[in-house]
UniProtKB/Swiss-Prot annotation:
It comes from Jannaschia sp. (strain CCS1). Residues 59-75, 82-144, 170-186 have a biased composition (Basic and acidic residues). This is Translation initiation factor IF-2. PANTHER family: TR-TYPE G DOMAIN-CONTAINING PROTEIN, TRANSLATION INITIATION FACTOR IF-2-RELATED. The keyword Protein biosynthesis applies. PROSITE patterns: G_TR_2, IF2.
């Protein structure tokens, strides 16, 4: 270790590193490598030396790379920033000082105002007490005996020393004590006014606490003034007649009685009813409360709103003759519209789709003799039962059209029933008399079965043979109608408020809701306010059957009415009222009554009934449709026709139907339920068409009700499951049973009838009783697998998953086929 003397030992933390290292290589070679170590230089200022910022600020050594102009600019910016900062600080201090002064000023004002109010209040109170004391002294002086009057003054005189005697200090001592006590109480509170004696504390004896407010003092003064003026007498209670409907809100009841709502609620609570002012109560409860408050009760019903409708009988002296209303009825394609066309000298049939009337047409005809006749042309299709019923209800005479070559048909019988139900006279028009196969006598004979006896067969019903094509018999028909109208002596009062029946209603794109109205009484004028069913409106325009605008319409005149707020139901009654408020009130009442009726019908269904219906509907498949039509009557007729389609397995359900064009909301409903949209004489608007294309909703348009019903019936038939039919193709008798390994029991059979097929179904009969039904596992003839075996041949059969086979059993062989079903 002698060579190591004077050197420091190795360690983890040693002195300076050497700049050389030895690098070793293979075979003992080494190489000396110079190593450079980079270290971060840390500048530590010496104690007492100024900082760099200070040196720069004091004009020390600056960077020579910065020009003098730049350095001057930087210094000016720094000085400007410092000046701006000091200015902002001064402004903040000034603003804070101003805010503090404003707060102090407001606080002082509030204190001064409070002090003034308190002093005014105390002054008023002191004045009141002084007045009370003076009144008490006067009362005591007035009631005291004369000899006691002189001594009564002595205590007052003794209480006031005249010469500044020794009594004064003795009297001031308690005041000083009170002041000291009040000051100590103020200090205990620690408040802003601690130690200060106020007038309020001096008057209240230092008790503190809340005193009477200024408003209370004013109320007391007002009561005293009224008492002095003799106003303390209770006012006489006003007894009112309070109208009570079936239900009334508590606040409305209080308003009608002119009582406080709180008093009414309190009275209800006293009677055991915890009800707020916005809750309704029934009429009996309201009557009890009204009697408790001393008022008189007038019970009214919600239906009383309809009493404004004029239902009085017309004076006989004001009745004038009116045109008869004739309804043309009969079976479809029996020539009703063609006959009316011939009478009107017009062509309506060409405008009807398929030549079939699908609306109630209302027309007015003037005959050659000058008589005015109003005609209603009803549809004859089976779907329009409700239309024919409405036509019979508003008519005076029914003309029953029967084709001479077709005789009495189902809708003819229905028309007879409607006429009898409406108790209106009937005239039989035997049409198509010009046809070669015409047999009018057969028509008369067939009518006898339905208790319609014509004059030719000693009855009272007139019958006329006519031809709509040639015009034969039309004068006789008009003469018969005029004769019947003359016998009826039809009259009406044209000078009263109008009343009519809605024959048809529709939603027109350009005109809005339009109703075809047959005026029955009075005169309907432009500008009249009316209510019809659940709708109301003001007559904006009247259009006659020729399409011309008219100012008014008298009795038995059919017109189109514009100006409704909604589409009414066909068959609704139109009544003219005086004000718009009455019309709106009646319409709202009827709408609410209809809602209540529907809700009651739904509520009447019990849970057991709902469960039973749901269980019954599990096996019923539905075809759902959304339908829009041009008029209300057609929509109702189509819905009735569609609901009749179906059986125990399939039915048609109309999710929604309405009047007017197909809209985007209809498409949305159809898409949500996966149903098609049917348009009858209407089209979809542009947004609806775009929505249908995007959502894949099918829209189908129809103009003939036959095609619509047939297509829906075909679609509903597609929901029916196919009918499975069995065809027996053969029989085989088992002669012997063999045990075959890998197969099981095999029956040696003789085909006695028909043919045995490998793919057919089989039944095993034992003593004519079916004991197994299944399929064949194998069918062999002479050890060969075959597809079929003809009658008279022997074969071997094995059943699938069945082994109980015995000799003399009979095998029945059959095939199944699926047959498509359709609704009839």
């Amino acid at each position: 270790m002698s060579d190591q003397d004077g050197k420091k030992p190795l360690g983890l933390s040693g002195g300076a590193r050497s700049g050389r290292v030895n690098q070793s290589f293979s075979r003992g070679r080494t190489k000396s490598v110079v190593v450079e170590t980079k270290r971060k230089r840390v500048m530590v200022p010496k104690p007492g030396a100024p900082s760099a910022a200070a040196q720069n600020a004091e004009g020390g050594k600056r960077d020579k790379s910065v020009p003098d102009a730049e350095m001057d600019r930087r210094l000016k910016a720094l000085q400007a920033a410092k000046a701006r900062e000091s200015q902002e600080a001064e402004e903040r201090v000034k603003a804070e000082r101003e805010r503090e002064e404003e707060r102090n000023r407001r606080r002082a004002d509030a204190e001064a105002k409070e002090r003034e109010e308190r002093e005014r209040e105390e002054a008023l109170k002191a004045k009141e007490e002084e007045d009370d004391r003076r009144k008490a002294e006067e009362e005591a002086r007035r009631n005291a005996p004369p000899e006691a009057a002189a001594p009564a003054v002595d205590p007052a005189a003794a209480a006031t020393p005249r010469g500044g005697g020794k009594a004064a200090p003795a009297r001031r001592e308690p005041e000083r004590d009170n002041k000291r006590e009040n000051r100590s109480r103020g200090n205990d509170g620690g408040g802003r006014r601690a130690g200060k004696l106020t007038v309020n504390q001096a008057m209240s004896g230092g008790e503190g606490g809340r005193q009477r407010s200024m408003a209370a003092m004013k109320r007391k003064q007002e009561r005293q003034r009224q008492k002095a003026m003799g106003g303390s007498v209770d006012r006489e209670k006003v007894i009112r007649d309070v109208k009570v409907p079936e239900t009334i809100i508590v606040a409305e009841l209080a308003n009608r009685m002119s009582e406080r709502v709180g008093d009414v609620v309190k009275a209800l609570m006293n009677n055991g009813m915890m009800i707020t002012q916005n809750q309704p109560i029934d009429a009996d409860t309201a009557e009890l409360i009204i009697e408790e408050f001393g008022h008189r009760v007038q019970r009214v019903s919600d239906a009383d709103v309809e009493q404004v409708i004029d239902t009085v009988e017309d004076d006989e002296g004001k009745l004038l003759p009116r045109p008869p209303v004739i309804t043309i009825m009969g079976h479809v394609d029996h020539g009703k519209t063609s006959l009316l066309d011939r009478i009107r000298q017009a062509n309506v049939v060409s405008g009807e789709a398929g030549g079939i009337t699908q609306h109630i047409g209302a027309y007015q005809v003037t005959t050659e003799s000058g008589a005015v006749l109003s005609f209603l042309d009803t549809p004859g299709h089976a779907a329009f039962t409700s239309m024919r019923a409405r036509g019979a209800q508003v008519t005076d005479i029914v003309v029953l059209v029967v084709a001479a070559d077709d005789a009495v048909m189902p809708q003819t019988i229905e028309a007879i029933a409607h006429a009898k139900a409406a108790e209106v006279p009937m005239i039989v028009a035997i049409n198509k008399i010009d046809r070669p196969a015409a047999d009018p006598q057969k028509v008369r004979t067939d009518l006898l079965q339905h208790e319609v006896i014509v004059e030719a067969m000693s009855g009272e019903v007139q019958d006329v043979e006519v031809s709509a094509m040639t015009g034969q018999g039309l004068p006789e028909l008009l003469e018969a109608i005029a004769l019947q109208a003359e016998l009826l002596e039809l009259k009406a009062n044209p000078d009263r408020a109008a009343q009519g029946a809605v024959i048809e209603a529709q939603l027109d794109v350009g005109r809005g809701p339009v109703a075809t109205v047959l005026v029955e009484k009075g005169t309907l004028r432009q500008g009249d306010i009316f209510v019809v069913g659940e709708q109301w409106g003001k007559v904006r325009a009247l259009v006659n059957d020729q399409g011309d605008r008219v100012k008014d319409a008298g009795p038995s005149v059919p017109v189109e009415v514009l100006g409704l707020n909604g589409t009414p139901e066909a068959g609704d009654v139109l009544n003219v009222v005086e004000t718009e408020a009455q019309a709106r009130e009646i319409a709202e009442y009827r709408e609410q009554a209809a809602k209540d009726k529907r809700a009651a019908a739904g509520a009447a269904t019990t849970l057991d009934q709902l469960l039973a219906n749901a269980k019954a509907d599990e096996n019923v498949r539905e075809l759902q449709v959304v339908m829009k039509a041009d008029v209300q009557g057609s929509a109702e007729a189509i819905v009735q026709a569609l609901e009749k389609i179906g059986n125990d397995e399939v039915r048609v359900r109309v999710l929604h139907y309405g009047v007017g064009a197909i809209t985007e909301s209809d498409i949305g409903l159809a898409e949500a339920s996966g149903t098609p949209v049917i348009g009858f004489n209407v089209r979809a608007n542009a947004p609806a068409r775009n929505a249908a294309n995007q959502k894949g909703v099918e829209i189908r348009y129809y103009s003939v009700i036959y095609d619509l019903v047939d297509d829906v019936k075909a679609a509903a038939s597609g929901l029916l499951g196919a009918e499975i039919r069995e065809n027996f193709i053969g029989y085989a008798n088992i002669k012997e049973v063999f045990k075959v390994s890998g197969v099981g029991n095999v029956a040696g059979c003789l085909v006695t009838e028909g043919v045995a097929r490998r793919s057919a179904g089989v039944r095993l009969l034992r003593d004519d009783v079916v004991i197994h039904e299944g399929t064949l596992k194998t069918l062999k003839r002479f050890k060969d697998e075959v597809k079929e075996v003809q009658s008279g041949q022997e074969c071997g059969m094995a059943f699938e998953n069945y082994e109980d086979i015995r000799p003399d059993d009979v095998i029945e062989i059959f095939e199944r086929e699926e047959v498509e079903r359709s609704l009839t």
